[in-house]
Amino acid sequence: MMNRLLVFLMLGAAFMLVVSAIDQDANEDVNMKRGLPCKCDGDKHMSGTFWMFGCPPGWHSCVVANAFCCKQ
């Protein structure tokens, strides 16, 4: 009975380790940017990042009408 419990606990720990590693990899890009994509002036695709509180240091506004769409 004790052996089955230990096997069950080890499998559960291994499962949690794998799930947490997959979750980190899936959210890595979102955590790096922490903003939403937006379209800069003169670009045909979403090349900028919309920041809630303005452009962070090292970034500049790339849309005349919206100061929160920024490019690095």
UniProtKB/Swiss-Prot annotation:
Location relative to the cell? Secreted; Nematocyst
* GO cellular component terms attached to this protein's record: extracellular region; nematocyst
GO terms (molecular function) for this protein are:
toxin activity
Q: Which residues form the propeptide?
A: 22-32
* Keyword field: Cleavage on pair of basic residues, Disulfide bond, Nematocyst, Neurotoxin, Secreted, Signal, Toxin
Signal peptide range? 1-21
Question: Can you list the disulfide-bonded cysteine pairs?
Answer: C38-C69, C40-C62, C55-C70
The Swiss-Prot or TrEMBL record describes its family as follows: Belongs to the sea anemone sodium channel inhibitory toxin family. Type I subfamily.
Protein's name in the database = U-actitoxin-Avd1f
What is the originating organism of this protein? Anemonia viridis
The taxonomy runs: Eukaryota, Metazoa, Cnidaria, Anthozoa, Hexacorallia
